[in-house]
């Protein structure tokens, strides 16, 4: 699902991706910048339990995906994730 710059996806294997996409970024020669945070199955279950509903994602992290708030939330609740950045289309 994508709302504003925020996207998230529940994968069939029980994992979860969340992040943001910024298009036409001047500093990157007008290319797309994409940050993806990946939660494995175990950590996604912890995440879902703590947020209550995926509908709360926007309330907690905004439709622009405030990654610092996401990081604080995950640290507070001992939720581990990996992240990757992609620049370009």
What are these regions (language model features)?
Residues 36-89:
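Low-complexity intrinsically disordered segments
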Residues 1-18, 25:
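Short, charged/polar N-terminal "headpieces" of proteins
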Residues 24-35:
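A short, polar/proline- and glycine-enriched secondary-structure boundary/capping micro-motif
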Residues 19-21, 38:
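Residue-level recognition of well-ordered beta-strand positions that form the cores
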